[in-house]
């Protein structure tokens, strides 16, 4: 009996497409998805009993591996005392204090329930603070399913081949300007034309939602310069790369200070969580201190805060975790490039720490959305199916990142490279 198929087919009766997030349907690779039952460390198991070495890690959050003992212990302890109050708790103070005291450029922070909430709230705050309306986002960058961001977005929008999104009125996107990632001149032209109306720039400082694309430090400095010149705010969307490329996130890669930063994924320890923070003078514009209103019944939920606190504290106290991830990440990157060269496969590997994408292309580098769109989707599909059959859970999309955890070992990397070597292209 194929339990995966049975469960997925029944799910289609009750959930649109059988899923609660489109990329999980595996529509772009043409097969039914495995239905996951359990996970431990770097391994997951589906309903048919098949085991996989997991390079998706819940799309990034599980940097400590699945069911980390300390995170599970924290969740159990808190759940015996509280589930939800809709009131202040010491746990939310403990996490907020840890984040503000150990991260750069975060004087104050506000907890929310998802990355989407964090980014949409940060943009609202930027508009309220500057008294301006327009926001620059970059083609291929995904900042959640907020109406104003669903234009030339990455992630599932790109995976599913959706040109935009039905249900988003023109009115909702009229103040969204599209920049080209790593193109200084084009962004400068946007400011020359709209500068007095631009509230801010929101950017993934390491893009992960069009696949991993690194930001040129020179480009990032130009963004800071333009924001300072025109009185706009620079917002780092570190929902994916925060606590992943380094404990302090992508800010460590640039000699640039953002005005606001958004977090999610890792900071929730695998539970629904998000946050946005920044300079005190900006954050104090939030209600109840200021006129920018944002609220949430489940924001700062005690169980989520306990999972986040256990995760963030463990990462902060163990910098060697990042050394390990860099070591195995470097081995994986070098290994696949050597194999591809030997086989004559056109391949670009973009990696930053524990996030990485294999782009099947004859380009020498992949540095923006237009480059990503030229990559060979059919070859990626063959590669994905090959690796899945070999026991590897990787993203079912050319336009997503693979992730590494502290539980991945050199043996896991060796097995991946062995499987990749048998891929015929």
UniProtKB/Swiss-Prot annotation:
<dbReference type="GO" id="GO:0030170">
    <property type="term" value="F:pyridoxal phosphate binding"/>
</dbReference>
<dbReference type="InterPro" id="IPR015422">
    <property type="entry name" value="PyrdxlP-dep_Trfase_small"/>
</dbReference>
<protein>
    <recommendedName>
        <fullName>Glutamate-1-semialdehyde 2,1-aminomutase</fullName>
        <ecNumber>5.4.3.8</ecNumber>
    </recommendedName>
</protein>
<dbReference type="InterPro" id="IPR004639">
    <property type="entry name" value="4pyrrol_synth_GluAld_NH2Trfase"/>
</dbReference>
<keyword id="KW-0663">Pyridoxal phosphate</keyword>
<dbReference type="GO" id="GO:0008483">
    <property type="term" value="F:transaminase activity"/>
</dbReference>
<dbReference type="GO" id="GO:0005737">
    <property type="term" value="C:cytoplasm"/>
</dbReference>
<dbReference type="InterPro" id="IPR049704">
    <property type="entry name" value="Aminotrans_3_PPA_site"/>
</dbReference>
<dbReference type="InterPro" id="IPR015421">
    <property type="entry name" value="PyrdxlP-dep_Trfase_major"/>
</dbReference>
<keyword id="KW-0963">Cytoplasm</keyword>
<keyword id="KW-0413">Isomerase</keyword>
<dbReference type="InterPro" id="IPR005814">
    <property type="entry name" value="Aminotrans_3"/>
</dbReference>
<dbReference type="Pfam" id="PF00202">
    <property type="entry name" value="Aminotran_3"/>
</dbReference>
<dbReference type="GO" id="GO:0006782">
    <property type="term" value="P:protoporphyrinogen IX biosynthetic process"/>
</dbReference>
<keyword id="KW-0627">Porphyrin biosynthesis</keyword>
<comment type="pathway">
    <text>Porphyrin-containing compound metabolism; protoporphyrin-IX biosynthesis; 5-aminolevulinate from L-glutamyl-tRNA(Glu): step 2/2.</text>
</comment>
<comment type="similarity">
    <text>Belongs to the class-III pyridoxal-phosphate-dependent aminotransferase family. HemL subfamily.</text>
</comment>
<feature type="modified residue" description="N6-(pyridoxal phosphate)lysine">
    <location>
        <position position="265"/>
    </location>
</feature>
<dbReference type="GO" id="GO:0042286">
    <property type="term" value="F:glutamate-1-semialdehyde 2,1-aminomutase activity"/>
</dbReference>
<comment type="subunit">
    <text>Homodimer.</text>
</comment>
<dbReference type="InterPro" id="IPR015424">
    <property type="entry name" value="PyrdxlP-dep_Trfase"/>
</dbReference>
């Amino acid at each position: 009996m194929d339990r995966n198929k049975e469960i997925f087919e029944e799910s289609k009766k009750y959930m649109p497409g059988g899923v609660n997030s489109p990329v999980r349907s595996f529509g772009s690779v043409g097969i039914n998805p495995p239905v996951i039952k359990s996970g431990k460390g770097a391994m997951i198991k589906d309903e048919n009993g098949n085991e996989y070495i997991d390079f998706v890690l819940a799309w990034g959050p599980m940097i400590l591996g699945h069911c980390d003992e300390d995170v599970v212990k924290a969740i159990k302890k808190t759940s015996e005392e509280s589930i939800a109050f809709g009131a202040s708790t010491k746990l939310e103070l403990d996490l907020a204090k840890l984040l503000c005291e150990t991260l750069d450029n975060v004087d104050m922070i506000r907890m929310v329930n998802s990355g989407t909430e964090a980014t949409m709230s940060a943009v609202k705050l930027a508009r309220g603070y500057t008294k301006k309306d327009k926001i620059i986002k970059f083609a291929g960058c995904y900042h959640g399913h907020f109406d104003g961001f669903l234009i030339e977005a990455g992630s599932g929008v790109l995976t599913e081949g959706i040109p935009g999104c039905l249900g988003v009125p023109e009115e909702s996107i009229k103040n969204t300007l599209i920049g080209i990632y790593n193109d200084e001149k084009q962004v400068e032209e946007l400011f020359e034309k709209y500068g007095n109306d631009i509230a801010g720039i929101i950017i993934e400082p390491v893009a992960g939602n069009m696949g991993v694309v690194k930001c040129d430090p020179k480009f990032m400095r130009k963004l800071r310069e333009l924001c300072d010149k025109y009185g706009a705010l620079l917002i780092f969307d570190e929902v994916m790369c925060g606590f992943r490329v380094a404990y302090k996130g992508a800010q460590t890669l640039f000699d640039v200070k953002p005005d606001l930063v958004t977090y999610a994924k890792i900071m929730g320890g695998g539970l629904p969580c998000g946050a946005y923070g920044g300079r005190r003078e900006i954050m104090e514009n939030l209600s109840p201190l200021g006129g920018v209103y944002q609220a949430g019944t489940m924001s700062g939920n005690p169980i989520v805060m306990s999972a986040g606190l256990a995760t963030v504290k463990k990462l902060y106290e163990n910098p060697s975790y990042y050394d390990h991830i860099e070591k195995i990440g470097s081995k994986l990157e070098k290994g696949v490039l050597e194999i591809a060269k030997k086989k004559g496969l056109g391949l670009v590997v973009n990696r930053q720490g524990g996030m990485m994408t294999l782009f099947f292309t004859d380009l020498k580098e992949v540095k923006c959305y237009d480059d990503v769109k030229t990559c060979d989707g059919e070859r990626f599909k063959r590669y994905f199916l090959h690796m899945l059959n070999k026991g590897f859970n990787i993203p079912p999309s050319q336009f997503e990142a693979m992730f590494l955890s502290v539980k991945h070992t050199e043996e896991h990397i060796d097995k991946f490279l062995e499987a990749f070597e048998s891929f015929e292209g």
